[in-house]
Amino acid sequence: LGEQTGRQGIERYYEHLLRGVKGKRFLQKDRFNRIIGPYERGIFDIPSKGSKNLILTLDLELQKYGEQLLKNKRGGIVVIEPQTGEVLSLVSAPSYDPNLLVGRMRSKNYRKLALDTISKPLFDRGLQAQYAPGSPFKTLNALIALQEGVINSNTTYKCNQGHFYAKGMFMDCHCKYGTHNNLLSGIYRSCNTYFANIYRKIIDDSGNGVHEGINIWKTHLISFGLGNYLGYDLPIGKKGFIPDASYYDYWYKKGG
């Protein structure tokens, strides 16, 4: 019988550790094909090496809770222990029953899942999907602005419950009308207006013009590890996308 081989996920990545190493024994037989003992006292034998154990760090209750949150929704949840990098929960929805991919019907079930172009249950949104960053991204822009010297901790902006970022385009903010925020209160309140102004300062004042400012901003983000593969122990993933000046030129036309 053939040996089972890890083909996907964790089993694939750690196949070399989970498999172990086969051993060999050389035996001596008589003319009646009966074993009479080890050949040359076993000096050519190769001992086998047992496979290593693999312990997942998933928190079962947290995993169940994440799956409940994404029931009848599309999205992904990744929960990581910052101090160790352990993955406590990894959820993708819509999902599928893993039992469908074992047994005699696995090929038929796989084709059915692969052909579902609406729900895409085989697409791991926790590892492969690309989403716009949320409010934690604001702190990176704050660090970049401080590094470039375009703001300091006392830089203050007024928030009128949002701001215009294009012609007729308004982004709401939960800050009260007329709130003045410096860097610390802007982070504390997660003020959209404050960090929109910080981003504009980075782009306008970091380099010699907007193009250079955008590219400087991107360089800083790459230094934080964004836009790169994480190097984790799963064989799939996306490195993310950070736009540069040429991207904006393409979509908004140079000088527009």
Per-range role (PLM):
Residues I35-G76, I80-Q83:
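Conserved, well-ordered alpha-helix/loop/beta-strand core segments that scaffold catalytic motifs
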Residues L1-S51, S89:
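Small/polar-residue-rich segments within soluble enzyme cores
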